[in-house]
Amino acid sequence: MSSRSTTIAFLFIATLLVFQCVSAQSSAEDADYLEKYQRIARAPKPKFIRFGRAGAKFIRFGRSRNTWEDGYASPSVNELYVKRGAKFIRFG
């Protein structure tokens, strides 16, 4: 009886050690994944919008002059401020 209980105890301890090693490896992989995911989540998001015209490029709404206004007559300063204010409210 003693050898049987010793064998069962040994197998139980060996199983616990195996599970401990496996969980340590998976937690290291999880930590790497979480670190990479958090780095991606913290990265600044580009604010682009694509117009529905064929062959149109992405237009960035920033402080620079918009290139899509080139074909039109030069609007007044107040119209530009109104237009840029609306873009800022919509897209941040």
Swiss-Prot record:
Q: Please explain the role this protein plays, according to its UniProt record.
A: FMRFamides and FMRFamide-like peptides are neuropeptides. GAKFIRF-amide has an excitatory effect on dissected pharyngeal myogenic muscle system.
- Expression sites (tissue/organ): Each flp gene is expressed in a distinct set of neurons. Flp-5 is expressed in the ASE sensory neurons, the 14 and M4 cholinergic pharyngeal motoneurons, and the PVT and RMG neurons. It is weakly expressed in the PB and 12 neurons. Also expressed in pharyngeal muscle.
Organism in which the protein naturally occurs: Caenorhabditis elegans
| Family statement drawn from the similarity comment of this UniProt entry | Belongs to the FARP (FMRFamide related peptide) family.
The alphabetized UniProt keywords are: Amidation, Cleavage on pair of basic residues, Neuropeptide, Secreted
Please give the GO cellular component terms listed in this UniProt entry. extracellular region
Chain positions found as Phenylalanine amide: F51, F61, F91
Q: Kindly provide the name given to this protein in its UniProt entry.
A: FMRFamide-like neuropeptides 5
Which segments are removed on maturation as propeptide?
A: 1-41, 64-82
